[in-house]
Structure formats: C-alpha cells, structure tokens
Amino acid sequence: MVRLKEKDGGVVFFVKAQPRSSRSAIIGEYDGKIKISLKAAPVDDAANVECCRFLAKSLGVASSRVRILSGHSSRIKRLTIDGMGAAEAATLFGEHLESVEFDL
C-alpha cells in the first residue's frame, strides 16, 4: 500500500527509482513506495531531473510543482507535488497503477 500524506499545501510520497532503464515508466508499488524506471543515468543529477519531469508529465501537472525533498543521491526519494491533495494524487496515480492501494 502506497502512503500519500498531505503536508504544507501539497502531497508527499516516496519513490523507488530504477535508473538506466530502457524506458521511463511507472512500474508499480514496492515496499510502500511508487516504483518508477528512469532512462537517465544517475550522473550529474540527470536521473533526479528526469524523475520530476517524468512524474509531472505522467500526472499532467507542471514540472515546477514536482520536487524532490530528500534522497537526491539515493534510489529511495521523498517527493512532493505542490498544490495537490492526497485524494487527487491517488486518482492520478491510480490511472497508471491499477492494482495498487493508497493510504491517505
């Protein structure tokens, strides 16, 4: 079950990133986190930038609203989407993750 928490006018969640993949995609749930594959390598912040841009594009929000709060040098990252509630985020992620439950 993926946990989404509302904090400071946005929604906070954890992502497990898999860099150097053949394509960028939202894969599913991994240990309470949203698992995504990223085409970019984890060099010079490229994977972090792609992580934010890819999630923004996939969820239909501006890339400036998606930020990494912690985990810049780790595969486990804590992200926020500004101006979005947990219920809205669960709905948007649910379009990509059919069998995943969300803890709001």
From Swiss-Prot:
SMART domains: DUF167. GO terms for cellular component: cytoplasm. It comes from the Bacteria. InterPro entries: DUF167 (IPR003746), YggU-like_sf (IPR036591). Belongs to the UPF0235 family. HAMAP family: UPF0235 (MF_00634). This is UPF0235 protein Paes_1868.
